[in-house]
Amino acid sequence: MSTVKVNGAKNGGERMVLPAGEAAAKYYPAYRENVPKKARKAVRPTKLRASLAPGTVCILLAGRFRGKRVVVLSQLEDTLVVTGPYKVNGVPIRRVNHRYVIATSAPKIDVSGVSVEKFTKAYFAKQKRSGPVKKDEAFFAENAPKNALPAERIADQKAVDAKLLPAIKAIPNMKEYLAASFALSNGDRPHLMKF
């Protein structure tokens, strides 16, 4: 604050004045500008359940393979890597959100022989299409080429199945258990079931 002399007998002689930078604005906008709220949420890594350890038999609750029993191979940062195995119930190696899975109390399958280092986010990423695709032509195309599964994925599936099948056969009735689908019928109470 600085003092400025003021003329006039009734004005007190001097007045305290703010510096130019701190003075109140002479112009106010007609519309108030929206100030974004400060985000109070932090992005934290997903905490996967302790029951979803590698080798656990789980039931898928959603998606194309809902009702199928699968074996957990590994945990990524936010998802699980599971397989049927494909030879037993047709479920390939895929990523699954842990919220859509029920861990069962079935005996764990030994997956120590399966190498899971290559199953990362990049491994499951979709391949980008090359060149622009016109919507009308793609919609009405009858003999459109289907995306073929890479030979690498097929070889990986066969390698995983070859390691898992002996471990599954070592546990009595496990192969039949994995091959059978899970479903609810009238009168079933899932909240009272022990999986």
From Swiss-Prot:
One GO-annotated biological process of the protein: cytoplasmic translation
Native source species: Schizosaccharomyces pombe (strain 972 / ATCC 24843)
GO terms for cellular component: cytosol; cytosolic large ribosomal subunit; nucleolus; nucleus; preribosome
The family this protein is said to belong to: Belongs to the eukaryotic ribosomal protein eL6 family.
Annotated localization: Cytoplasm; Nucleus; Nucleus, Nucleolus
Keywords of this entry: Cytoplasm, Nucleus, Phosphoprotein, Ribonucleoprotein, Ribosomal protein
Protein name per the record: Large ribosomal subunit protein eL6
Primary gene name: rpl6
Residues modified as Phosphoserine: S105, S115
Database matches in Pfam families: Ribosomal_L6e
